[in-house]
């Protein structure tokens, strides 16, 4: 299984509650509406919570501030990913997603990468 991991930071001009609300209530349904076009089989949003516990983990490890959340998108096969990223409808869906992401995500402080999952337990 192929997975995209997208570590998000909100734009500075958006408050935290508005960021989470938009991501969940506006962007989430948009992703669902184009899932077939991009060939995705699963989409999960993980919203950062428990600031006190996060701060303890950061301090104990000497890490930087946490991301505001993480998006994960799965494709069942490399073929599904390639088809979803190269078909005309997939390319248009990606354009829509990126355009919408610019409304609430600070691209310069966020990170995205592709992975192959290895389930341990």
Task: Name these PLM-found stretches.
Residues 1-121:
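Macromolecular interaction modules
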